[in-house]
């Protein structure tokens, strides 16, 4: 399992530990990932994704999984998240055509 957020694409970054004597040694900054069960309002399903804690706060701020996925770029999303996004788009399109008819 990769250390990458399934919604934002945030992965490990590289930097330095800097000692008091200013000696730099390489280190990795790993994202704070946690498994989360996210509810889709339009689909009525729960999805288990491994996302960063920052992504979880962003989901709450934007108003839920569906809104976040519809506004996210496809390059950032994992293949699982892309499938969920396609399902949400199809459901929204079906609802729009039902209202128009």
From Swiss-Prot:
Gene assigned in the entry: rpmB
Highest taxon listed in the record's lineage: Bacteria
S-S bridge residues: none
GO biological process per UniProt: translation
Pfam families xrefs: Ribosomal_L28 (PF00830)
One function term, GO molecular function aspect: structural constituent of ribosome
HAMAP family tied to this protein: Ribosomal_bL28
GO CC terms: cytosolic large ribosomal subunit
InterPro entries cross-referenced by the UniProt entry: Ribosomal_bL28, Ribosomal_bL28/bL31-like_sf, Ribosomal_bL28_bact-type, Ribosomal_bL28_sf
Protein name: Large ribosomal subunit protein bL28
Annotated family: Belongs to the bacterial ribosomal protein bL28 family.
Keywords tagged on the record: Ribonucleoprotein, Ribosomal protein
Taxonomic lineage from the root: Bacteria, Pseudomonadati, Pseudomonadota, Alphaproteobacteria, Caulobacterales
């Amino acid at each position: 399992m990769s250390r990458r957020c399934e919604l934002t694409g945030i992965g490990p970054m590289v930097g330095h530990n800097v000692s008091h004597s200013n000696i730099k040694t390489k280190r990795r900054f790993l994202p704070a990932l946690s498994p989360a069960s996210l509810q889709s309002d339009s689909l009525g399903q729960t999805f288990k994704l491994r996302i960063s804690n920052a992504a979880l706060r962003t989901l709450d701020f934007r108003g839920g999984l569906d809104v976040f996925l519809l506004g996210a770029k496809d390059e950032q999303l994992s293949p699982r998240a892309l499938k969920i996004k396609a399902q949400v788009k199809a459901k929204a399109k079906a609802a729009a055509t039902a209202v128009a008819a």
